A protein has these predicted regions:
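Feature for extracytoplasmic/surface-facing segments of secreted or surface-associated proteins
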Residues: 18-234, 274
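C-terminal motif of bacterial Sec signal peptides marking the signal peptidase cleavage site
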Residues: 13-16
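Positively charged n-region of N-terminal signal peptides that target proteins for export
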Residues: 1-4
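N-terminal pro-sequences and low-complexity stem/linker regions of secreted or lumenal proteins
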Residues: 224-803
Length: 803
């Protein structure tokens, strides 16, 4: 029999003509989702008596198929995320006709409103026996009429066919399709299924209509709101956001900045304070032992779970590692930092109990109060967290016994040059990080956003631009790097945990497709136990730690060889290419790239402009410099700019649609030579410049984050996505007139989420078949908001906004 697409009205007529006692045997397929497909979620069918008769999981397109065998009407349900990111249930009613062999039934926001109205209840999972007992043809017909009446102007504006206006089956897709009115409608209309409301249109033309599960529906969608929604669907963006500015500081975990944050009433946050690890004054709390650090025992091979050997009595003395002298610009090595006591309690400590947040009596660079720079490298971070950060207790021992690797200047088995500095945090409850606190109160904050790659800056900036990882190659073809540059994290004999080959002037590549390679087997076993693909191409040596890119900022190739800690030019697809192909303007602004960025500082510091650029320009934070496609195309290359260009673009109203902004090194917040107060000062200035242009600010989203956590302690759950990460939590703030004020969002995200936001807003495809922006949006259970049930999954950040 030919497969048929049944409208709800037709199903109702069939139900009326054929008693519910008729047993059905129907092959059903369909799709689950709205603006995006719901991937990896269970679809459950419940029969007229409240029995769950079948359940299957959606595929990578959000589609499903099963055979329904029983007596209808049936209610199909699937877990989903609501418009604000909270857990919700998608649903649809299906009443098969006698003898019907097949049907297409979709679960989307419209079918959900219809089902909730028919049942008189908002579902949390499959309906129960009592709810199903009240479901009959009359209630279904009335629900159909109510929803159609409220949404009729929207259907008319989007030219939804009359025979489909009561059933949006076939309309789910992850990307807009002009040939599918349902896809276009779902891409710009915002459904709050739990509350039965629908937000239509934008700005002055926006209207919110209501189709509650019980009670009187609102009036129909106003014509102006429907027209506004259609204009969005036909316009350049799917939201009112016309400019996205992504600001990327450095090396702070979520707990490192927001460990003492108290959210607004009605909001919750997972941090040091809420977990009872600290008190509001920064001293140890009743659950301080949750963060107690353990010692490990030596092993012959790299392991994610070193055997524990008891706890530290006190933290190791914090060290001065990486602390820069503001006059000589020399960095300290692993010597004790006398500002901190040598007997700190074994757990997190408030940094500003011992040093000021900012030196108020000084100006410029001298006002920055620096602290030691914790190790933040790939294999160390995997070992510190155990992959998922379930135990929290190995941060200190791994750092203190491994350091930044023996291929790093000043680091040796006798002195790994790491102490207890990684356990320090800023305390907002005591007045620290006032701008970050204010931004969280006035805009939206995520407490479940993560660095993409275990380890440091280079790999994470590359992930921000590509949702992927760089690899060693020769003329674009896979090749083997010099032997001295291949990682070996197996401990040296006679040391507690000092890696055999690791460091910024040495081991940084790994062939993770080969379990026989040092360090690979432990991580692959962790992945295999959780059925997570490694994403390691056969024979590819991936760069997992910091090397310089293959070009200088002007596009001149850098030498590649055993004594050159530079990775070859990359062909990995970038967001720059995708935006350019779509005709969306973009720039990547990196502090220090323009000579004008550092001219005043060069004069003040009595150094050359070239020296000032060397100090301030973060070449590994300018990841598009690594791309042969970007650097080989004059048009693409022209999108790489400095902060003087950013200031000019803001002043002349020529800011591109998508901007990535990287502060100068001393403003980045990176421990050792910067601090959170310096990053705040940079953000304050940037926000003021954007908000000084009301027309720009009105339709702008500023996404504020860091590249990675810098090796600092954090309590957040880590979802393993592939061999490369994710890594620990970092902050993500969304500042915009459209941000949900004071909201703490729990949807799971990483740096691919930035790309997913851009792609959804400007209707772009994922960057490549293997890039992480292909991952589905996360779905969670009520009461468990941090762990996706359909992982690996990462958010698109849309739940930080209310459009």
């Amino acid at each position: 029999m030919k497969r048929c697409l049944l409208s709800l009205a037709l199903l109702l007529s069939l139900t009326a003509c054929h008693p519910q006692a008729v047993r059905s045997h129907v092959a059903v397929d369909g799709a689950v989702g709205g603006a995006v497909p719901m991937v990896g979620v269970p679809v459950t069918a419940t029969d007229h008596a409240g029995r769950r008769v079948v359940s299957v999981v959606t595929d990578t397109q959000g589609r499903f198929s099963f055979v329904l065998d029983g007596v209808g009407p049936f209610v199909l349900t699937a877990p989903s995320g609501d418009d604000d990111g909270a857990p919700a249930t998608l649903s649809a009613v299906f009443s098969p006709a006698a003898g019907q062999a097949s049907a297409v039934v979709n679960l989307d926001p419209v079918t959900t409103l219809q089902t909730q109205r028919a049942l008189g209840a908002v579902l949390d999972g499959a309906p129960d026996t009592v709810q199903m007992a009240g479901l009959d043809a009359a209630r279904i017909a009335n629900a159909d009429k109510d929803v159609a009446g409220v949404l009729a102007p929207l259907y008319a504006a989007f030219h939804v066919p009359a025979d489909a206006a009561n059933d949006s089956a076939g309309g789910t897709s992850s990307h807009a399709d002009a040939g599918n009115p349902w896809t276009a409608l779902f891409s710009v209309v915002h459904f709050d299924m739990r509350h039965g409301t629908v937000g239509v249109g934008s700005d002055a033309d926006r209207a919110v209509v209501s189709v509650p599960a019980q009670g009187v529906p609102s009036a129909a969608v106003p014509a102006r709101a429907a027209a506004s929604a259609l204009a969005l669907a036909q316009g350049a963006t799917t939201t009112p956001i016309q400019h996205v500015i992504v600001v990327i500081g450095e090396n702070q975990t979520f707990d490192g900045l927001f460990g003492g944050y108290v959210p607004a009433a009605g909001q919750s946050v997972k941090n040091l304070l809420s977990e009872g690890i600290i008190k509001a004054d920064g001293t140890p709390g009743p659950n301080f032992a949750l963060a107690a650090q353990s010692k490990g025992t030596p092993s012959q091979a790299y392991t994610l779970q070193p055997e524990r050997a008891g706890s530290y009595a006190t933290l190791p003395q914090p060290l001065q590692i990486g602390e820069m002298d503001p006059v000589t610009f020399e960095n300290a090595v692993g010597t004790p930092d006398a500002r901190f006591p040598g007997n700190l309690p074994n757990g997190p400590f408030q940094i500003t109990r011992y040093v000021p947040y900012r030196d108020a009596g000084k100006d410029g660079l001298a006002a920055t109060v620096v602290t030691g720079d914790p190790v933040h490298r790939f294999f160390q971070m995997w070992q510190q967290t155990g992959g998922d950060n379930a135990r929290l207790d190995m941060f200190t021992w791994v750092a203190a016994n491994t350091g930044m690797g023996g291929d790093t200047k000043g680091v040796s088995p006798a002195n790994p040059a790491q102490g207890g500095e990684l356990m320090g945090f800023m305390n907002m409850s005591a007045g620290d990080a006032p701008l970050f606190r204010s931004l969280a109160q006035h805009y939206a904050l995520s407490d479940n956003y993560h660095q993409s790659i275990m380890g440091g800056t280079g790999a994470n900036f590359f992930a921000i631009a590509t949702a992927d990882a760089p690899f060693f190659n020769k003329d674009g073809q896979l090749a083997v790097p010099p032997a001295n540059q291949i990682e070996n994290p197996d401990p040296m004999p006679g040391t507690p945990n000092f890696y055999t080959r690791d460091g910024y002037s040495g081991g940084s590549y790994v062939d993770c497709s080969d379990p026989k390679q040092p360090g690979v087997a432990a991580i692959r076993a962790f992945l295999d136990a959780r059925h997570i693909p490694s994403k390691c191409a056969p024979g590819a040596y991936y760069l997992v730690n910091n090397y310089n890119p293959g070009y200088d900022m002007d596009g001149r190739p850098e030498p590649i060889g055993p004594d050159n800690y530079t990775y070859p030019p990359q062909t990995v697809p970038t967001i720059a290419e995708a935006l350019a192909k779509r005709g969306v303007s973009w720039k990547w602004y990196t502090g220090g790239r323009d000579t004008a960025d550092v001219a005043a500082e060069a004069s003040a510091w009595h150094v050359s402009v070239a020296k000032a650029q060397m100090l301030q320009y973060n070449n590994i934070g300018d990841p598009l410099v690594a791309s042969s496609k970007v650097m080989g195309d004059p048009t693409l290359k022209s999108g790489l700019a400095g902060l003087a260009t950013l200031d000019s673009d803001l002043a002349h109203h020529t800011l591109p649609a998508v901007s990535f902004v990287v502060p100068k090194g001393f403003d980045s917040g990176h421990p050792g030579y910067s601090a959170p107060a310096s990053y705040e000062a940079f953000l304050k200035d940037l926000l003021a410049k954007v908000q000084a242009d009301p027309a720009l600010w009105a339709h702008t989203a500023i996404l504020i984050t860091t590249d990675e956590g810098g090796g600092h302690f954090d309590t957040g759950y880590i979802q393993t996505v592939d061999f490369f990460g994710d890594g620990p939590r970092i902050a993500m703030l969304a500042a915009s007139p459209y941000a949900r004020k004071g909201v703490v969002d729990h949807a799971y995200g990483d740096h691919a989420s930035i790309l997913k936001f851009i792609e959804r807003n400007w209707r772009l495809q994922p960057l490549s078949p293997r890039s992480r922006d292909n991952l589905p949006d996360p779905v969670t259970k009520v009461g468990h908001p941090y762990r996706p049930i359909n992982g690996p999954a990462v958010d698109d950040l849309m739940s930080l906004f209310q459009f």
